[in-house]
Amino acid sequence: AADRSTALRECCRLVDLLIDAGHHPTFIDLGGGVPMSYLDDAEQWRDYHAARDAMVDGYARPFTWKADPLDTTYPFHQSPVRGEWLKDVLSGGVAEMLRERSLRLHLEPGRSLLDGCGVILAEVAFVKERSDGLPLVGLAMNRTQCRTTSDDYLIDPLLVTDRTTGEEVEAFLVGAYCIEDELILRRRIRFPYGVEPGDVIA
């Protein structure tokens, strides 16, 4: 929030120069990037990093595809988010600076408006092992349908099933494209009661 506050203060100073030059700006567009959290608490985020660091340092069995260190990840737990973040942005006199100049603040809240409202569902198409024994769960979707600019999407999927017994399986989720790197997630996922074709992953 601090960098946005600084930017708004600087914009207000530039607005003053524009007004002195005879212009009449009416708003500042802060753009997007309103932070949100995908995890319920910070401990989940810390636990992930501890497990990742142990893997990278050789103290734990790799849980990622080809031991990928997943160096580039979105901050899946952040604070403050949404409204509290905006309060911080507008604190320290920034809101007053905007009011004094009769400036509207435009903002692109994007996915933060729908925080917790979205879901992707995919049917399990197959469960198999590669020739080297690597377990794969194939979904009736492809990686482009949920890929981000990060190395991985760090929210564990949910298996939608009424099964309460079965053999535990750990596997990688792969998509429908017939290419080597058609991974939905780059982490091994645990299914306590197994997974079967026809199940749904959310």
Residue ranges and their predicted role:
Residues A1-D29, A125-V127:
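Active-site-proximal beta-alpha core segment in soluble small-molecule metabolic enzymes
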Residues I28-P35, P109-R111:
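Glycine-rich beta-strand-to-loop/alpha-helix junction loops that act as flexible
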Residues A21-T26, P35-A67:
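Internal, charge-rich low-complexity segments
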Residues A2-R4, Y38-Q44, C117-V119, T149-D152:
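Short acidic, glycine/serine/threonine-rich loops at helix termini
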Residues A7-L14, Q44, A51-M55, L90:
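A general structural detector for well-ordered alpha-helical segments in enzyme core domains, enriched
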Residues A51-A202:
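Charged (often Lys/Glu-rich) extended helix/loop segments that serve as interaction or gating elements
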